[in-house]
Amino acid sequence: MGLDGGTIPTRCELVKTKKKEVKVFDKDQVDFGKWFLCALAQDTLSEPIVLDDLGNLFNKDNIIEALLNGSLETSKNFSHIRSLRSIYTVNFSPNPAHEKDSTVSPWLCPITKIEVGSSNYKFKFLKTCGHVFSEKAFKELKNDDSNNNNNNNNNNKKEIDSSKDNLSCFLCSKEYITNDLITINPSGEEFEQMKVTLQEKLANSKKKSSKKSDKKPDNKKRSLESNLASESSFTSNTLAQTNEEISKKMKSEAFSSIFKSNSNNDTTKTPNK
C-alpha cells in the first residue's frame, strides 16, 4: 500500500512513543546536600560538626569511624583526612526561626542574619575558634573600619597600619590571620585553588617529617655514644675504687703483721728477766 507520494510508511513513523524525560541538574538540591548533609555518609548534620581544609562539612562521629576502619585512606575525595588534626570543629550560630522538619536553615550569620546555606552568599569559617560568618559580614565590618580610619588624624597612620594585622573574631575576639579563613562549600576556581593550597600543605608536612626521620638516627647514635662513655667512665671509676680498697687492705695487713711480730718478741723476752 502506498500513499499519494508513492512511499510506504514504516511502523516507527505511525506509532508515537513517549519522549524520555531529560533530568535537569537541580542546583538547589545539590546545595541542600552540601550544607545540611554529611559529605561522607550523607546523613543529616548534627553536632559535633567538623570541617576539612576543602570546606566540606561532616559529622564528627562519621569521621572517627572512617579513621578507625581505614576507609578514608582509599577514599577518592577525602584521603587528605589522615587524623583528627585534619579537621576543625564548627561552631554555627543557631537560627531562632528554625523549627524541626522546616525548610528554614538551622544556622545563620550572627552579624548579617543571613541564613547559612543561602545560594547567593558565601560563608567563611575561622580555624582558631570555629565560628562561621557570611562573607558580607567581613566586607561590611572592613568598610566600617576603613571609614573610621579615614576620620583619624594623619599622626595615627602608623598605629592604624600596624593594627591591620591584628584581626579578631567578631564574637569571641580570638585573634586570627587571613590564612585561618576557610570558605565553606566553595565552587569553581576557588575550590581548585583550595585543592592546590592543600596539596602544598601536605607536601610541606611530608618534607618536615622526612627531615625529622633523618635526624633520628643521629640522635640515637649520640645517645648510644653517651651511654657507652658513661658506662666506660663508670667502669674506670669502679676499677680505681677497687684498686684503692685492695691497696688499703694490703697496707693494713702488712701493718698488722708487723704489730704481731713485735708483740711476739716482747713475750719471748719477759721470762729471761
From Swiss-Prot:
Location, primary (coarse class): nucleus
Region forming the signal peptide: none
GO biological process, one term: mitotic DNA replication termination
Gene Ontology CC entries for this record: chromosome; nucleus
Chain spans, region Disordered: 202-247
Database matches in Pfam families: Rtf2
Sorted UniProt keywords: Chromosome
Biased composition (Polar residues): 225-244
Subcellular location: Chromosome
Composition-biased stretches (Basic and acidic residues): 211-224
Biological function: Replication termination factor which is a component of the elongating replisome. Interacts with nascent DNA.
Sequence similarity: Belongs to the rtf2 family.
Protein name from the UniProt record: Replication termination factor 2
